[in-house]
């Protein structure tokens, strides 16, 4: 490869690097302007009277990963309790910035290349980077068991006297006679067959 080709490749590489640098600077300026607007809109609502400011510098290449793949927003977070924490971050490169409200702003990004400046404001001389407030509601459930008494009144007709049922009496007699007649006929048929068998055996013996 000649010197001319190498020079062309070097010039192309330098031009690419310059273009990337210009794009990065433009993106950085846009992100800084957006963060400045967010600070101007958020900080007046979340200031306190007697506050101490503590500056904390974070390294430039910083990646924030949460369970929902979200990065802590460059806004000010304030709570109503005595401990007030305000966190301000100035990123240089960000993407997909969503500002749902004045108090909390979620900025989704994969990698942040920034030089954030964290300001912690505390009233009770306690510096907190992330404040978590847990509210526990203790509810007691009282179940009242009500007893319901149902009184059922059954009016039964008083039996004046036992009446003689002629139909059931006659039916019982007919049923008894029917069973006896069936037994009689069965026994008679059994004995008649038995007598025929004995008689045939006697005749056979007599013939022999």
Swiss-Prot record:
User: Is Transmembrane found in the keyword set?
Assistant: yes
Region annotation (Disordered) ranges? 42-125
The membrane topology noted for this protein in its Swiss-Prot or TrEMBL record is: Single-pass type I membrane protein
Alphabetical keyword list: Glycoprotein, Membrane, Receptor, Signal, Transmembrane, Transmembrane helix
Q: Which Pfam families match?
A: MGC-24 (PF05283)
Cite a GO CC annotation.
external side of plasma membrane
Instruction: Mark out the compositionally biased spans (Low complexity).
Output: 108-122
- This one is known as Porimin
């Amino acid at each position: 490869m000649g010197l001319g080709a190498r020079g062309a490749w070097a010039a192309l590489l330098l031009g690419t690097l310059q273009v990337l640098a210009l794009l990065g600077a433009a993106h950085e300026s846009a992100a800084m302007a957006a963060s400045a607007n967010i600070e101007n809109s958020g900080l007046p609502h979340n200031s306190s009277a007697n506050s101490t400011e503590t500056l904390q510098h974070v390294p430039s290449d910083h990646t924030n990963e949460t369970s929902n793949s979200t990065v802590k927003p460059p806004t000010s977070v304030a709570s109503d309790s005595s401990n007030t924490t305000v966190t301000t971050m100035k990123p240089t490169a960000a993407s997909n910035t969503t500002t749902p409200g004045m108090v909390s702003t979620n900025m989704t990004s994969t990698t942040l290349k920034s030089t954030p400046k964290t300001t912690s404001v505390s009233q009770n001389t306690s510096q907190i980077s992330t404040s978590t407030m847990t509210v526990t509601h203790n509810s007691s459930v009282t179940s009242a068991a009500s007893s319901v008494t149902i009184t059922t009144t059954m009016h039964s007709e008083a039996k004046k006297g036992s009446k003689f049922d002629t139909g059931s009496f006659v039916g019982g007699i007919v049923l008894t006679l029917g069973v006896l007649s069936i037994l009689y006929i069965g026994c008679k048929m059994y004995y008649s067959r038995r007598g025929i068998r004995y008689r045939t055996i006697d005749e056979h013996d007599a013939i022999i």
